[in-house]
Amino acid sequence: MKKQIFNEENVSIEKKIEPKQEFDATKVSVEDETEQLTAELIIEKGFTPSRFWIRGLLAVLVLFGLAVIARSVQCLIDSVQAHQWIDLAFAIVFFMVSLAGIGAIIREWYWLVYLRKHQDTQHISKQLLMDELLVTSGQDNVVICHQILADLKSLPHIAVAKQRWQSQLNEAYNAKEVLYLFSENVLKPLDTQVKQIIAKSATENAIIVAVSPLVIVDMLMIAWRNIALVNKISRLYGMRLGYLSRLKLFKMVLTNMVFAGATEMATDVGMDFFSQNLTAKVSLRAAQGIGVGLLTARLGIKAMEFCRPIAFQKEERPKISEIRQQLLIAVKNRFFAKNEA
């Protein structure tokens, strides 16, 4: 056996070369958006009461209503038997007020159930639109779309949009395709109209705050206009809301607004001011007006997302940047042009 001698210089060391890794910024933004939506759902779920408390509250209200009616009837009987006609008049008034109050409670509960069904329909549509491998039939979704059309029948041009959507339907379409056609033919014109209303309201609020010197009057007027904006958006999407259901809608919208925060909006506005060379002469009132206008726009967009019967797809989701440029131009033309003159 021959002796083998190894020289370190002859030994070749293989280096493992890894391929270059590239990161796409668009993918990062999508992940951030997904995380934000997930967190919004978590916060919204945290603010939603459990079914146990809801059923308990319903049972208490039912018992209270029965007790009030029984007491009213007892007062009527006692007044008639005792020939106390003044007490009888008060008993009749109390009985009528009790019936009106119970009827109002039942009506408000009905609108809360309606809002819950609206949320369930939106959640189902969101799951169907996000599922890329969905191959189920679209007949069930056709029924859902007809239910939505029943709520929208009072709006103009809905009949034409309904005929256009039905003419494009095919039995071979799956659930996702049916929802896409319904969104394109029926809801997209409504989306355009709602965006115009949001942009107009945000611009007017910004100008009001930028020009008006009365802070308290501004706050009251902006609050009233924002409430009117949400009510107008809900009516355009065919939502019928009661007092409690409207409060619940406001709660959901404001909860998501608070979570999202205003830091990203402030950054975007700062970039626009730098690009348009407005930082040298921007005033405090103009900045406050722009901030109020952007908050109004965000409130309208969030209300739009909650009131729309079918959830937005990723490319359809409205963005505040669509309104921001129009808002800045309006404030510049109305406020800075006035100062220069």
Curated annotation (Swiss-Prot):
Keywords: Cell inner membrane, Cell membrane, Membrane, Transmembrane, Transmembrane helix. The keyword Cell inner membrane applies. The chain crosses the membrane at residues 57-77, 86-106, 204-224. It comes from the Bacteria. InterPro entries: DUF697, UPF0283. It is found in: Cell inner membrane. It is a multi-pass membrane protein. One of its GO terms (cellular component) is plasma membrane. It holds the Pfam family DUF697. Belongs to the UPF0283 family. This is UPF0283 membrane protein HD_1769. It comes from Haemophilus ducreyi (strain 35000HP / ATCC 700724).
